[in-house]
């Protein structure tokens, strides 16, 4: 059976000391009130080796926000999947809309990143989603289908290790909001694509997270949908009270 997951994406926020403090505070809150879902925090690279040992791995998984598409070598500024795994991190976000937009990550680059993450026993949280122009042109289905090419080259066994996150890029920071119905509609479509490629059992066991503007106030409604298995949380993951409010939507 697929897992319900709430994953926090800290993005480029929190210096090292602030990140350690946030991880400790979250760890204490969840130790006192155990979650009914898997909880993951994906932090900047510099936090990983410090945050991983201070959280209870039975309650909180730790991940990176990216990794390189190369194994090792003369790639100044890059951090490999092997390096991420060596910190004790278990997860890595790949294909986030910000990486696609600002760093021009292609289907081919992301395919390499996914393979290297899996080779180092990391669990990829693979992001897909359409921008405003694509949504207004009603092209969201073909956009996410094209983006899934980065992971649809995998064997069924390897694909089963992937967590998907749908980001309605058009609804993030634009003042427009995606309804719970819109979220369910596209999540169901994504699951149907997985079923067509890998069969119903694999599709039924794939967690698909919602990466829109998820808050404590709307999480319960979003997560009540049959094909929404949790959230990839940005801003609300930077405050324990907000992040825990979203986690508690599964109670």
Curated annotation (Swiss-Prot):
Gene3D superfamilies: Aldolase class I
Location of this chain's protein in the cell: Cytoplasm
A molecular function GO annotation: triose-phosphate isomerase activity
Residues the entry annotates as binding substrate: 9-11, 173, 213, 234-235
InterPro entries in UniProt: Aldolase_TIM (IPR013785), TIM_sf (IPR035990), TrioseP_Isoase_bac/euk (IPR022896), Triosephosphate_isomerase (IPR000652), Triosephosphate_isomerase_AS (IPR020861)
Pathway: Carbohydrate biosynthesis; gluconeogenesis; Carbohydrate degradation; glycolysis; D-glyceraldehyde 3-phosphate from glycerone phosphate: step 1/1
Species of the source: Phocaeicola vulgatus (strain ATCC 8482 / DSM 1447 / JCM 5826 / CCUG 4940 / NBRC 14291 / NCTC 11154)
Main location per the UniProt record: cytoplasm
Family affiliation: Belongs to the triosephosphate isomerase family.
Keyword Cytoplasm set for record: yes
Enzyme class: isomerase
GO CC field: cytosol
Subunit structure: Homodimer.
EC number: 5.3.1.1
Reaction catalysis annotation: D-glyceraldehyde 3-phosphate = dihydroxyacetone phosphate
NCBIfam families to which the protein is assigned, alphabetical: tim (TIGR00419)
Name of this chain's protein: Triosephosphate isomerase
Keyword annotations of the record: Cytoplasm, Gluconeogenesis, Glycolysis, Isomerase
Active site: 96 (electrophile), 167 (proton acceptor)
């Amino acid at each position: 059976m697929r897992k319900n997951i709430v994953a926090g994406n800290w993005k480029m926020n929190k210096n090292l000391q602030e990140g350690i403090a946030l991880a400790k505070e979250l760890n204490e809150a969840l130790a006192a009130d155990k979650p009914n879902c898997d909880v993951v925090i994906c932090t900047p690279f510099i936090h990983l080796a410090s945050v991983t040992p201070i959280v209870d791995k039975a309650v909180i998984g730790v991940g990176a926000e990216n990794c390189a598409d190369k194994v090792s070598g003369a790639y100044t500024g890059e951090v490999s999947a092997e390096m991420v795994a060596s910190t004790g991190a278990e997860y890595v976000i790949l294909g986030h809309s910000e990486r696609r937009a600002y760093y021009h990550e292609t289907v081919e680059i992301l395919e390499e990143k996914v393979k290297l993450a899996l080779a180092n026993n990391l669990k990829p949280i693979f992001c897909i989603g359409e921008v405003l122009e694509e949504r207004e042109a009603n092209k969201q289905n073909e956009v996410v289908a094209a983006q899934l090419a980065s992971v649809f080259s995998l064997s069924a066994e390897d694909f089963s290790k992937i967590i998907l996150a749908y980001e309605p890029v058009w609804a993030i920071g634009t003042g427009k909001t995606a309804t719970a119905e819109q979220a369910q509609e596209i999540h169901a479509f994504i699951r149907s694509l997985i079923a067509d490629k890998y069969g119903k059992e694999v599709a039924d066991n794939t967690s698909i997270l919602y990466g829109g503007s998820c808050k404590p106030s709307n999480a319960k409604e979003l997560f009540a949908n049959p094909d929404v298995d949790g959230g990839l949380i940005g801003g609300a993951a930077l405050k324990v009270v907000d992040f825990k409010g979203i986690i508690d939507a599964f109670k």
